[in-house]
């Protein structure tokens, strides 16, 4: 006689209720002790073989967001290490309350949004530094100085200065791999930066990448999700926009990985938010030129889009084209350059339909052009 599988017991999920409880708990602690506990938590990597992900940094930064975007109770008390760990564990366990998190029909998509949430803190240091260096090359050497002009008009600092100062802080963050949090005394970075860039440029740079201690609550409040949607669990932390906390004595870095990721994402984010499709169109052309310059170094036969169009005209063919064709003896590679950056919905959704719709005019379009 064949055994029948036991029916699954459906447990009522209560994400919203548990978030409210966590926020209520957080509001009973003073801000300074919470940030101190978070800084201390990242001074030791719990499992070096797993890296900083073993400290659950995505949970810590969500706790920071909720802590500073909710009003304090009238009487607050200092937070200790046990209190902090309890909050982090409760936030980690929230994933059990997220609708469809363990959906058997969407296993890969469900795992995907969880992995995206964590990979920010797992990127190799070399990759983070290379990303910053490549960006400097793209924005400062292409399109006739357009990116530098529009960036300087808005923020009062050249891209050259931004990337050089960012490289300084990125390298500083690589000195001690055994700690994720760091403190840089004001006298140290001023001695290194003022002689080369001057006081005004350093100030404008810090205005761009740091938030003052007494402005932390105002900054975090701008990211508050009043509806407490489950998607908030997977979003990038607000500190991606301001990776430094500025105090009179120096700069506090809560996460070196987040710092390096922020420094390399800030410029494209600011340009995209300010100039929208105009920026995207220009950057797409930059990427096409950059890829072309790399392909030209290959010994292979490279056919550009311009040459492809010419061949089409000669043969009276009407069809879409890719940007490059690379011909080898063993086969042909079709390359189409697309300046694609996944939006928030793509990052946190586990709906195949929603992801497909969002990628229809970018990634999927490029694949179809290559097939045609």
Regions found by a protein language model. Give the residues of each.
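Residue-identity detector for threonine
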Residues: 9-13, 19, 36, 44, ...
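Interfaces and regulatory segments of ATP-dependent nucleotide/adenylate/phosphodiester-chemistry enzymes
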Residues: 24, 31, 36-43, 66-69, ...
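Long, charged/polar, low-complexity intrinsically disordered N-terminal extensions
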Residues: 1-90
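Long, acidic, intrinsically disordered low-complexity segments
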Residues: 1-21, 221-227, 232-233, 315-343
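Catalytic core segments in nucleotide and nucleic-acid processing enzymes
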Residues: 267-372
């Amino acid at each position: 006689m064949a055994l029948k599988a036991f029916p699954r017991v459906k447990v009522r999920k209560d994400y919203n209720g548990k978030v409210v409880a966590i926020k209520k708990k957080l509001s009973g602690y003073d801000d300074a002790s919470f940030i101190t506990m978070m800084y201390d938590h990242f001074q030791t990597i719990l499992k070096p073989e797993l890296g900083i992900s073993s400290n659950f940094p995505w949970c810590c930064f969500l706790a920071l967001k909720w802590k500073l975007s909710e009003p304090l109770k009238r009487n607050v008390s200092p937070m200790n290490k046990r209190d902090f760990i309890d909050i982090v564990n409760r936030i980690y366990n929230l994933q059990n309350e997220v609708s469809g998190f363990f959906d058997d029909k969407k296993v890969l998509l469900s795992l995907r949004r969880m992995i995206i949430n964590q990979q920010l803190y797992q990127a190799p240091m070399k990759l983070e530094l290379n990303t910053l260096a490549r960006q400097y090359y793209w924005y400062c050497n292409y399109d006739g100085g357009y990116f530098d002009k529009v960036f300087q008009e808005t923020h009062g600092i050249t891209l050259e200065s931004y990337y050089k100062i960012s490289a300084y802080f990125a390298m500083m963050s690589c000195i001690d791999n055994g700690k994720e949090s760091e403190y840089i005394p004001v006298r140290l970075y001023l001695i290194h930066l003022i002689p080369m860039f001057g006081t005004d440029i350093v100030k404008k740079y810090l205005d761009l990448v740091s938030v003052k201690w007494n402005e932390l609550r105002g900054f975090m409040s701008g990211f508050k999700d009043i509806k407490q949607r489950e998607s908030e669990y997977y979003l990038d932390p607000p500190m991606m926009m301001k990776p430094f906390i500025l105090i009179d004595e120096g700069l506090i870095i809560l996460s070196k990985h987040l710092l390096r990721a922020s420094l390399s994402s800030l410029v494209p984010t600011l340009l995209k938010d300010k100039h929208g499709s105009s920026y995207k169109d220009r950057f797409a052309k930059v990427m096409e030129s950059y890829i072309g310059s790399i392909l030209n170094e290959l010994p292979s036969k490279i056919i550009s889009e311009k040459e492809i169009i010419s061949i089409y005209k000669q043969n009276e063919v009407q069809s879409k084209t890719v940007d490059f064709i690379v011909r080898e003896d063993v086969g042909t590679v079709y390359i189409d350059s697309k300046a694609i950056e996944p939006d928030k919905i793509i990052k946190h959704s586990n709906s195949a339909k929603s992801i497909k719709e969002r990628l229809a005019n970018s990634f999927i379009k490029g694949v179809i052009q290559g097939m045609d």
